[in-house]
Amino acid sequence: MPTINQLIRKRRKSSLARKKSPALQKCPQKRGVCLQVKTKTPKKPNSALRKVAWVRLSNGQEVIAYIGGEGHNLQEHSIVLIQGGRVKDLPGVRYHIVRGTLDCAAVKNRKQSRSRYGAKRPK
């Protein structure tokens, strides 16, 4: 344990909280280009093939982003918009691709939670 004099000479350093989505640089969304589109398997109790994309952002950083919804039209060189939001059972995936913007099409035949998947109101 430090003495009073040691604390006067050098203060205790307060630990900074880790940022949840540092690549966005305090922006709500960022644009990027898909480098590759693949599937990843989730952590232990779950089993699936989750669709993810490696994206190079407009600030030069590369991140892994999750493609939500059933089916997608993304491929290499697609321009996408990403936002923060991790996927709990995929380590390293801290961003989501916004559906229905830029090159990413909306989810077809979506009736509920449409705004999350860029789907228009059915007639």
Swiss-Prot record:
Q: Which UniProt keywords apply?
A: Methylation, Ribonucleoprotein, Ribosomal protein, RNA-binding, rRNA-binding, tRNA-binding
State a single Gene Ontology molecular function. Answer: tRNA binding
Q: Where is this region: Disordered?
A: 1-25
Its encoding gene is what? rpsL
The major lineage groups are: Bacteria, Pseudomonadati, Chlamydiota, Chlamydiia, Chlamydiales
> Where is the sequence biased in composition, kind Basic residues?
8-21
GO biological process terms on file: translation
GO cellular component term of the entry, any: small ribosomal subunit
PANTHER family recorded for this chain?
A: 30S RIBOSOMAL PROTEIN S12 FAMILY MEMBER
Modification 3-methylthioaspartic acid occurs at: D89
Query: What is the stated purpose of this protein?
Result: With S4 and S5 plays an important role in translational accuracy. Interacts with and stabilizes bases of the 16S rRNA that are involved in tRNA selection in the A site and with the mRNA backbone. Located at the interface of the 30S and 50S subunits, it traverses the body of the 30S subunit contacting proteins on the other side and probably holding the rRNA structure together. The combined cluster of proteins S8, S12 and S17 appears to hold together the shoulder and platform of the 30S subunit.
- What's the subunit arrangement here? Part of the 30S ribosomal subunit. Contacts proteins S8 and S17. May interact with IF1 in the 30S initiation complex.
One Pfam family this sequence matches: Ribosom_S12_S23
Family to which the UniProt record says this protein belongs: Belongs to the universal ribosomal protein uS12 family.
> What name goes with this protein?
Small ribosomal subunit protein uS12
